[in-house]
Amino acid sequence: MTINTTRIETMLAERGLTKAAYAKRCGISRQSISTIVRRGTCEPKTAGKLAAGLGVPVAEIIEERS
């Protein structure tokens, strides 16, 4: 899945979360968070964890394909 990394980083800033704290909330490693943000993609299961860590639906963090 293509992830809207700008949206994720904005949400992290709004919530005052570091990537390390976010990773802990998501149940994945900080290194994985960094890789996902750098590449802008992840598996659907991981996208679910990322969204849950922010308390939002997956639709809010994925890029829409045209």
Where are these regions (language model features)?
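Residues in the helix-turn-helix
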Residues: A21, S32, E60
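A short, Lys/Arg-rich alpha-helix, primarily the initiator
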Residues: M1-A21
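Short alpha-helical "recognition helix" segments of helix-turn-helix
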Residues: Y22-A23, L50
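Recognition helix of helix-turn-helix/homeodomain-like DNA-binding domains
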Residues: I28-C42
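Short, basic-rich loop-to-helix N-cap that marks the start of a DNA-contacting helix
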Residues: R39-A52
